[in-house]
Amino acid sequence: MDTILGILNVQKLHTTSKHQENKDKPPETRRRGTINSILLAMSTVFPVFVFFTHREDGFDGNILLRFTTLVFPFSYSAAQHFLLLSSNWGSSCRSSSGLYRALCLALNALLAVFFVISICSLILFTADEWDDNEALTICSMLFPSLLLSSTCLLSISCNFATFQFVDSGPDIPIDLLIFLCLVILHKTSPLEDYEYLPYFAIPSFILVLVRSFKERLLPRKSSPPAAAWRVAVFLLILVLTISVYVFISRVCWAVIESKWEALTSD
């Protein structure tokens, strides 16, 4: 562990110097942050609005409404993982070697998988029929909350260059609440009763917005030194995120199977 932490501390010095260089391009950073903030706000507000305005009558085959419900959270997930992938690949992965390069490539592969799952899920879930209240709750509450919570923790609270959780101070309680909501939503999602799902999904939306806008208005000035517990928390968040996307991919596969059975039965 001491060897790994030493590698991460060296990499942190390299990342810090890169961070200082990136300060020379504030307009680009501000534009990207503004776009991310708008997309995140739409990703949280619109699914909640759709849920409360259409939970009685459903969508009645309205594919456009299904698409607009899903497009913001799934696009946010895809965009954030693509940005993480491009940043992680361009910053230090190509110039590194040995164990660090292997870890970097493995994380890049995971980010690419998350990106692909987000895009494919948007297409498949839009094409699927939401013929009951349960399907509406899953697509407008469960999926957006799982995606936004896991993406927020990975993209804001973790550093892929040093493989560690980087938040401190008042940010940690917010992260903990987001993590708890994510665990509850993910572990209760296989259950048949979704009646209480909005009571956890809506708080997770609020927490993600608070954490994101706090990072935008009051960003951290530097990353903390590498520590074993920070690496462990990073791995815990990563494992939970993998579990979330495995669950979503299984639902995608179920949709594909149902569509295939419908085609072959005709």
Swiss-Prot record:
InterPro entries: UPF0328 (IPR019081). Pfam families: DUF2463. It comes from the Eukaryota. Belongs to the UPF0328 family. This is UPF0328 protein ECU05_1610/ECU11_0120. It comes from Encephalitozoon cuniculi (strain GB-M1) (Microsporidian parasite).
